[in-house]
Structure formats: C-alpha cells, structure tokens
C-alpha cells in the first residue's frame, strides 16, 4: 500500500530551511520531511556519546551547502568534539573552523561575530525594521544568514568562557539580526539556564538517563 509523502509547508523565501530526516507516522500512514528553520531560532542538540550529534551537525552543514549559495548563508564552526568538522574548512560557505587549541583564532571569531551583530543592528535601523527577516523581505540581499555550529559546548565553556562570557550576548541578540547558533552537547547540566533560555529549538537524541536532557 502506498504511503503518502506529505508536501512541505509553504516557506518564506527569506528563511533558511534544512532537511535532517523523515518522520514516519504509521498510524496515519504518513511520511514527511523533518526540517529545521535556521532563521527563526537557535537549536540545542543533546545526546550521549556516539548518539549522532556530530553526524547531525554534518547533515545541517551539507544541507545548507547543497541548497544555498555562500552569498545566502555563511557558516562558522567551533569544534571542541571529534575534530571531524574541520574537514569543512575549505567549504565555500565556511568562514572558518576553530578547534580547542586555537586560542587566538577563537577570540578573533568572537570579536568578528560581535562586530557583525552591531553592524547588522545599524543596517536594520537604517531602514526602520527590527528583524532580519523583515530586512530580507524588504528586498535587501547584502547580508547573508550566519549559522554558527558548536560541537561540545561544555568543553568550550570550561576552557574559554570562565572569565569573560563572549557567547551569551551572541546567543541573545543573534536571531534578530540573522545569526543562528546550533549547539551540540552531551547533556544540559553544566550549560546553565541563562544559555538554555536562548534555545527555543531543542533536539534530543539517545540519552542514557533523563537527567542528561532535563532543563
């Protein structure tokens, strides 16, 4: 018997969507794409070791690269996990990959992202809009969506964010100006509620215990 393959909902041409899999609903005899809107919210991916967190980040990177141009989307990658993501350093969309031993490079990336947020706030104010989507819908194409992917948030926080918290302002202000964060981690504990409150999108892979993903 044929199973219906549901058509995707109509999407705004200003938004960045990526397909990460298929949802199977046997009781409805229905299959549909599982897609993430990377323009409207930050995403937190939680899962135990070997649960597929890095694979999911790679799926997102490839999905963006296959469906959007570098003029539409720029990627920045912070890999404090398996270091596999540095294989994407030469991707045309990728502005840089930072690993755990790249102290100066990481600081420069934080400065660049902070400067970009301030620049974009000024650009939006110039035409009287308060969101990046409104800026794009006004016909502006000079600014790409920026997506920052972080593998192993706990390690990043422990190694570099104890004295100066570079990330919290970026998490808080990014979405409104076209900067999205996709963060992968073993568990929510140790990240802190002030970080988690900026992630409306939450994806839970296999976890050994419910405490790993409880908020």
List where the protein language model places each region.
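P-loop NTPase catalytic phosphate-binding loop
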Residues: 7-133, 138-211
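Conserved P-loop NTPase
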Residues: 1, 208-215
């Amino acid at each position: 018997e044929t199973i219906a393959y549901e058509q995707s909902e109509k999407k705004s041409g200003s938004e960045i969507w990526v397909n990460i899999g298929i949802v199977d609903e046997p009781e409805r005899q229905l299959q549909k794409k599982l897609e993430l809107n990377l323009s409207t919210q930050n995403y937190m991916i939680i899962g135990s070791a070997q649960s597929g967190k890095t694979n999911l980040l790679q799926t997102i990177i490839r999905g963006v690269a296959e469906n959007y141009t570098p003029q539409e989307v720029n990627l920045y990658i912070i890999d404090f996990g398996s270091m596999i993501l540095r294989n994407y350093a030469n991707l045309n969309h990728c502005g840089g990959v930072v690993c755990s031993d790249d102290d100066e490079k990481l600081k420069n990336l934080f400065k660049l992202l902070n400067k970009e947020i301030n620049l974009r706030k000024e650009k939006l104010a110039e035409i009287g809009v308060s969101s990046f989507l409104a800026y794009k819908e006004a016909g502006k194409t000079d600014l790409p969506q920026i997506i920052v992917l972080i593998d192993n948030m706990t390690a990043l926080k422990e190694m570099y964010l104890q004295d100066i918290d570079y990330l919290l302002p970026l998490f808080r202000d990014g979405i409104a100006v076209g900067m999205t964060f996709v963060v992968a981690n073993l568990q929510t504990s140790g990240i802190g509620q002030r970080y988690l409150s900026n992630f409306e999108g939450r994806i839970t892979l296999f976890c050994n215990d419910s405490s790993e993903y409880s908020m």
